[in-house]
């Protein structure tokens, strides 16, 4: 699944 967990995305997607 296309999960984005690097810092820039972690803010939005809270990984």
Swiss-Prot record:
Subcellular location: Secreted
Domain of life (superkingdom): Eukaryota
Tissue: Expressed by the venom duct.
GO molecular function, one term: acetylcholine receptor inhibitor activity
Keywords recorded for this protein, A-Z: Acetylcholine receptor inhibiting toxin, Amidation, Disulfide bond, Ion channel impairing toxin, Neurotoxin, Postsynaptic neurotoxin, Secreted, Toxin
Listed transmembrane segments: none
Modified positions (Cysteine amide) in chain numbering: 15
Disulfide bridges in this chain: 4-9, 5-15
GO cellular component, one term: extracellular region
Domain-related comment: The cysteine framework is I (CC-C-C). Alpha3/5 pattern.
Functional summary from the UniProt entry: Alpha-conotoxins act on postsynaptic membranes, they bind to the nicotinic acetylcholine receptors (nAChR) and thus inhibit them.
Similarity comment: family membership: Belongs to the conotoxin A superfamily.
Protein name: Alpha-conotoxin-like MIB
Organism the protein comes from: Conus magus (Magical cone)
Lineage: Eukaryota, Metazoa, Spiralia, Lophotrochozoa, Mollusca
